[in-house]
């Protein structure tokens, strides 16, 4: 069973509180999503494998640690997931970036996939799927399905705000993946939005309605 972790660092919780506010501007919202993703990255990347490497300091030769293989991929679920990419890339700039495009049918609440663009060697990479919201879990499940169909097996899902229903759905569908979130909220409302949530992350990131 994959692990589920709420990353409750004080800085993350403080920034998340500002992010939720209706009064937060598009500019500030965008910056906060980026900052929170970067802060979460410290914990999300904790389990990366290390290997020994011989280096030379100004004083002597020594054996130190580096990330093994460096085969990482960040895969945002479009469009809102794009807002989290730069925060993680600032920590692992050599990571490749794939894209999975989906939209949610407003009547059925089911995700519809319209784009999959991934590195050719995605099956060899440690993958971090990012989306600010884990609501019903439908988009997350479909994204992981797409990755597994292409041979991927080492997958983590990273969200800013999650609903219990979405977490359970993703765990039931893919019990092997790890899930990280900055907040576990109360529930979904009748329209499938997280309560208290932060509204439509995509609209707030890009200033659309």
Curated annotation (Swiss-Prot):
The organism's place on the tree of life at top rank: Bacteria
Its source organism is Streptococcus suis (strain 05ZYH33)
UniProt xrefs under Gene3D superfamilies: 3.40.50.2020
**Positions with a binding annotation for 5-phospho-alpha-D-ribose 1-diphosphate:** 79, 104, 131-139, 200
Single GO MF descriptor: GTP binding
Briefly describe activity regulation. Answer: Allosterically activated by GTP.
Q: Which UniProt keywords apply?
A: Allosteric enzyme, Glycosyltransferase, GTP-binding, Magnesium, Nucleotide-binding, Transferase
Q: Which reactions fall under this protein's catalytic activity?
A: UMP + diphosphate = 5-phospho-alpha-D-ribose 1-diphosphate + uracil
What's the source species' lineage? Bacteria, Bacillati, Bacillota, Bacilli, Lactobacillales
- What is the protein named? Uracil phosphoribosyltransferase
Q: Which cofactor does it need?
A: Mg(2+)
Q: Which residues bind uracil?
A: 194, 199-201
């Amino acid at each position: 069973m994959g692990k589920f972790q709420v990353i409750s660092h004080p800085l993350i919780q403080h920034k998340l509180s500002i992010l939720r506010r209706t009064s937060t501007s598009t500019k500030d919202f965008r910056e906060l999503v980026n900052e929170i993703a970067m802060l979460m990255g410290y914990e999300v990347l904790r389990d990366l494998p290390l290997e020994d490497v011989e280096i030379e300091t100004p004083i002597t030769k020594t054996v130190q640690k580096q990330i093994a293989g460096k085969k990482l991929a960040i895969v945002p679920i479009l469009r809102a997931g794009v807002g989290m990419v730069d925060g993680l890339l600032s920590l692992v700039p050599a990571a490749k970036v794939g894209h999975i495009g989906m939209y949610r049918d407003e009547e059925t609440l089911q995700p519809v996939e319209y784009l999959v663009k991934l590195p050719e060697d995605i099956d060899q990479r440690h993958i971090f799927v990012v989306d600010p919201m884990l609501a019903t879990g439908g988009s997350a499940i479909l994204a992981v399905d797409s990755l597994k169909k292409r041979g991927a097996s080492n997958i983590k899902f990273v969200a800013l705000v999650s609903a219990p229903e979405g977490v359970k759905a993703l765990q039931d569908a893919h019990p092997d993946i790890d899930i990280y979130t900055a907040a576990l909220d109360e529930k979904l409302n009748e329209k499938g939005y997280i309560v208290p949530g932060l509204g439509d992350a995509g609209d707030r990131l890009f200033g659309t309605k």
